[in-house]
A protein has these predicted regions:
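Transition-metal
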Residues: 1-108, 242-250, 274-287
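A short hydrophobic beta-strand segment most commonly corresponding to one strand
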Residues: 170-171, 219-235
Length: 287
């Protein structure tokens, strides 16, 4: 008989999912796949493109292209994480069948409670974050539905309202829908606009798509698991954002996503057609 990974509050999950951030609880802190020795093993077999790491004593407003490397290899970084002042993420760990099974187990527990917004949980991905004490993850947002689960150590994630143009603009979301990097502009006068979520082992938080956030780790090594997915809502939202970006080029001020269902459906059809035309126009590769 399988053990539940989440402590589900059905009313909270159904009522708040994707509408606002909220705290969750989980039972994964002792899971063998999420302990440092197993993660060291995983980091050495993942493709290099699936491991991102850098110095972690960063400002909240760090620009992506200026992010300093730590001068170490992947293996050195994860083995010395206690002292090397670094931040690391193991991306798409579901490539490994054991981690894929864990991801699916987690999301199948969530699925029955979010079907009104997300009938299907698609494009499932899992990420493991391993950070030195006092590491900072700069201000950024992500385009997926996300549940961040704290496994080891403590951190504070400060999350902002994606509907507030003072913290993220429609133009930034439109750029991300085309694949722009996740880091966003940040100024000190935005600090009071965020909501801090302190996370200890067993704690977690739901981060709705495109809600900006930044993270500061406590006095010990931190390990966190993110289980993420896309939905019909997220796919439609990204399509509308891409079409809106194109409309701006013609001087049109478009209606943001999720404010008009028929507009969003129409924009999704336009986005699909434009994607087909662009793919057809690409020169065929020669072998």
């Amino acid at each position: 008989m399988s053990t539940s990974h989440f402590v589900i509050d059905a009313a909270r999950l159904a009522g708040r999912f994707e509408r606002e951030p909220f705290a969750v609880r989980h039972q994964l802190t002792a899971h063998a796949l999420l302990q440092l020795p197993r993660l060291i093993e995983l980091a050495t077999v993942l493709p290099e493109s699936s491991v991102e790491y850098n110095q972690a004593d960063l400002p909240i407003e760090q620009e992506y292209l200026a992010t300093p490397r730590n001068g170490l290899t992947i293996d050195q970084t994860i083995r010395q994480i206690e002292d090397c002042k670094s931040w690391m993420v193991l991306k798409n760990v579901e490539r490994d069948p054991q981690y894929k099974a864990l991801l699916d187990e987690c999301l199948e527990e969530i699925a029955p409670h979010v079907r009104t917004i997300s009938p299907q949980l698609e494009h499932r991905e899992a990420f493991v974050f391993i950070s030195s004490p006092q590491a900072v993850t700069p201000y950024h947002c992500d385009p997926e539905h996300n549940f961040l689960l704290q496994i080891r150590g403590n951190k504070v994630m400060t999350i902002f309202d994606r509907g507030d143009p003072r913290v993220i603009s429609e133009r930034h979301m439109e750029a991300m829908a085309f694949g722009a990097h996740r880091n966003l502009p940040y100024t000190e006068d935005m600090a009071a606009l965020g909501r801090p979520f302190p996370l200890a082992p067993g704690d977690g938080v739901h981060v709705p798509m495109y809600c900006p956030h930044w993270v500061r780790v406590g006095q010990a090594v931190s390990i966190s698991l993110s289980v993420t997915f896309r939905s019909l809502v997220s796919v439609r939202r990204d399509a509308a954002l891409r079409v809106n970006a194109r409309l701006r080029r013609f001087g049109i001020s478009p209606v943001p996503p999720l404010q008009s269902s028929w507009r969003d459906h129409a924009k999704q059809a336009v986005d699909r057609a434009l994607g087909f035309v662009e793919r057809a126009a690409r020169p065929a590769s020669r072998g």
